[in-house]
């Protein structure tokens, strides 16, 4: 996410490396490089200019204290301005009403229907809501089919009327259905187009007028940069939407949309989404995003994702096994599967400070774990529970069962043993426990 922008900003801050104090010359050079980085990231020139002017004004009036270098001070100023540019703080998401109504709008291909499913999953699993998805795209039967599949995957009902070509009546009937079935939030997936047109805008505006939604979310493909901002302006002028959703943040995103939309339409970014998995939806926090753009990672979100997936009782049992040096292949497989549930692996690693740059050109995907899973799944339950029982003969059988080379199995066994030895060493630390573990 934003790797190129991150590198360019880090390069700009190097202008201040070794400087004892901030002065007009090094500020000017740094600010010029920051402006270029923003423009190359597809941020509107006016926005980039105003942003860097504010950074310059703050830097000129700042004094460097002994504990902070000029470079660190500039990073702090830029981070604060990025946070402000993207909205300052988390935006409220209004789910009052019975039912509350959320209208989803955007161009075709923006990830609108997938987001509708993700939002329903988020509201059901994390907010305890009982959502109803509504297929109000009257032009594309495939959109109805897609929503039906998503609803089945997450256990959420989907309302549709395949023969009805009136989006307004579909939305109104869906709300009646929600009331009769005690659904407390209705998510209406409207039709998209390949480009903005009057008929599309009129239809969405009519649905809005008829159902009076609590929230109108404009879904935008973050990889489209300035085009996304221009589309947002057109939608906002007609719909006066309440918030923005940025999708496809796991792609080759330059950052222009994330950094420009709030300033341009004066509406907050409420959610960000990456990948096709239905649990890859996050509330948008400007400060956390600013940290990621500056290569500082996002430990807070990483911890929250882990807490949502890992069972506390299971964690206690695992802790005891690690203390007794009884960590086995089944434990390893269980942990691997929990980590995969947290989201895109490369995206998760990018939340670790400094890791985003290190893995930029490394091919990391969930597929990388498939070989390990195949090897463990080819073991008998006894072998999984007793790593020391795996003889050379058993390794041959496991390799054949997993469709792998013997060398692959040997390499994995070696890595697993190294991990067990590391755990053993940590258990021998003072106090006889691993750091952070309860005694």
Regions from the language model: what does each represent?
Residues 171-175, 179, 183, 195, ...:
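Conserved phosphate-handling catalytic cores of large alpha/beta enzymes
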Residues 6-8, 25-35, 280-281, 387-393:
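Short acidic alpha-helix initiation/capping motifs at coil-to-helix transition points
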Residues 2-19, 288-439:
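Long amphipathic alpha-helical segments used for membrane anchoring, targeting, substrate engagement
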Residues 16, 42-44, 78, 107, ...:
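Residue-level signature of catalytic and energy-coupling elements of molecular machines
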Residues 109-110, 139-141, 165-167, 192-196, ...:
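Short, small-residue-enriched loops and turns at beta-alpha junctions
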Residues 141-147, 228-231:
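Short, glycine/polar-rich helix-capping loops at beta-to-alpha or helix-loop-helix junctions
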Residues 9-136, 143-164, 170-188:
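Primarily NTPase-proximal linker/entry elements flanking Walker-type ATP/GTP-binding cores
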């Amino acid at each position: 996410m934003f790797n190129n922008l991150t590198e360019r900003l880090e390069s700009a801050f190097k202008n201040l490396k070794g400087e004892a104090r901030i002065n007009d010359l090094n500020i000017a050079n740094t600010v010029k490089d920051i402006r270029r980085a923003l423009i190359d990231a597809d941020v509107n020139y006016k926005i980039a200019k105003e942003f860097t002017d504010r950074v310059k004004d703050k830097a000129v009036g700042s004094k460097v204290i002994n504990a902070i270098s000029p470079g660190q001070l500039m990073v702090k100023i830029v981070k604060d301005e990025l946070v402000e540019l993207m909205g300052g703080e988390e935006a409220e998401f209004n789910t009052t009403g019975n039912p509350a109504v959320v209208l989803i709008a955007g161009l075709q291909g923006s990830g609108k229907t997938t987001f509708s499913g993700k939002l329903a999953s988020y509201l059901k699993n994390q907010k305890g809501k009982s959502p109803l998805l509504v297929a109000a795209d009257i032009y594309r039967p495939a959109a109805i089919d897609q929503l039906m599949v998503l609803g089945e995957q997450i256990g959420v009902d989907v309302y549709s009327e395949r023969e009805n070509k009136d989006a307004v009546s579909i939305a109104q009937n869906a709300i009646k259905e929600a009331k009769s079935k005690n659904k407390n939030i209705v998510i209406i997936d409207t039709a998209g187009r390949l480009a903005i047109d009057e008929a599309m805008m009129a239809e969405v505006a009519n649905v809005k007028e008829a159902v009076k939604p609590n929230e109108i979310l404009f879904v935008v493909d973050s990889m489209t940069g300035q085009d996304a901002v221009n589309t947002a302006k057109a939608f906002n002028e007609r719909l006066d939407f309440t918030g923005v959703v940025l999708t496809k943040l796991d792609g080759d995103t330059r950052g222009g949309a994330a950094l420009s939309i709030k300033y341009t339409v004066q509406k907050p970014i409420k959610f960000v989404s990456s990948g096709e998995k239905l649990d890859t939806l996050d509330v948008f926090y400007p400060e956390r995003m600013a940290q990621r753009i500056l290569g500082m990672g996002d430990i807070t979100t990483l911890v929250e994702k882990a807490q949502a997936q890992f069972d506390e009782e299971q964690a206690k049992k695992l802790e005891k096994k690690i203390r007794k040096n009884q960590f086995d292949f089944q434990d390893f497989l269980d942990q691997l599967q929990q980590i995969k549930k947290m989201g895109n692996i490369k995206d998760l690693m990018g939340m670790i400070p400094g890791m985003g740059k290190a893995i930029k050109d490394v091919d990391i995907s969930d597929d990388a774990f498939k070989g390990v899973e195949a090897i463990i799944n080819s073991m008998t339950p006894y072998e999984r529970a007793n790593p020391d029982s795996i003889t050379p003969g058993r390794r041959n059988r496991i390799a054949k069962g997993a469709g792998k080379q013997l060398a692959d199995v040997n390499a994995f066994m070696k890595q697993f043993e190294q991990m067990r030895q590391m755990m053993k060493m940590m258990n021998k630390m003072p106090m006889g426990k691993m750091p952070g573990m309860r005694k």
